[in-house]
């Protein structure tokens, strides 16, 4: 499962770490301590993962101290509020440009650094490691809207690809990638 990735993909505004007692079911034990943190609008799964690693260490330290001094009381979970993150499937990595730009931006962030969002350019696989929502653009979904910046139309709005990797090539900034490709406005991706 990929709970951190799904939080980013769904555009959740915050996430966190909870310590809990062990129980027979998966993540069903009584909760001990929860530390929440906002998810940045540009933050990737990898960046959030690394932040949560440190927050998790703090939570564990605070939990041990709280149990030792009696300031933490276990709280039963409400099973009706429980959510489970399904396993990630590489099939979700394919960018569907008929979807809104914000959704695709969240998908790209949630799949970076693995498994990485992708599309096709001239029959070759193009991985999209980083992107941003491009304001003030619209057009036929999947078409290039700017020949100097890699801005691609979506079902609602547009995305600017910032870091890409063409099949068989190294990862690079789109500003370095584009000049060697000579792509024209209207060029189709997907």
Model-inferred region functions:
Residues 26, 31, 72, 84, ...:
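Short clusters of hydrophobic/aromatic residues that line enzyme substrate/ligand-binding pockets
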Residues 9, 23, 84-87, 118, ...:
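Short secondary-structure boundary/capping segments
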Residues 34-35, 45-48, 57, 86, ...:
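Alpha-helix boundary/capping detector
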Residues 92, 97-190:
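An anion-binding loop in the catalytic cleft
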Residues 55, 60, 77-83, 88-92, ...:
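Short gly/pro-enriched beta-turn/loop segments at secondary-structure junctions
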Residues 1-84:
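Donor/substrate-binding cores of folate-linked one-carbon enzymes
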